[in-house]
């Protein structure tokens, strides 16, 4: 599956997309956007099933990669150290790792 990079999204709050310290770049939390540029929302287990949520997490990963591409440049990145994924889900939804794999599978 090919990756279609997006424009770097403008922060919704009082933060920046990238903060540098030494040789490390920290990417702020990112969301997922649909093809029209709208933020995708919903609760897994209620509004989205696991497969839909996997694809939303993949879009988050593409947003992160787009921030790296547009704000840093891939040539400056040697290694991704950590991806932190949070899943907004119902209390009975128990396969959060499957959802986060949508993002992790890109790295």
Feature map (PLM): residue ranges:
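N-terminal presequence-like segments and the immediate start of the first folded domain
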Residues: 1-81, 89-107
């Amino acid at each position: 599956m090919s990756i279609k990079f997006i424009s770097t999204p403008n922060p919704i709050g009082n933060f920046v997309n990238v903060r540098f310290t030494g040789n490390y770049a920290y990417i702020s939390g990112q969301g997922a956007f649909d093809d029209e540029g709208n933020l995708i929302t919903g609760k897994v287990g209620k509004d989205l099933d696991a497969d839909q949520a996997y694809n939303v997490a993949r879009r988050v990963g593409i947003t992160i990669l787009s921030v790296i591409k547009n704000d840093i440049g891939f040539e400056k990145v040697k290694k991704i150290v950590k991806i932190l994924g949070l899943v907004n889900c119902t209390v009975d939804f128990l396969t959060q790792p499957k959802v986060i794999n949508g993002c992790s599978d890109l790295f």
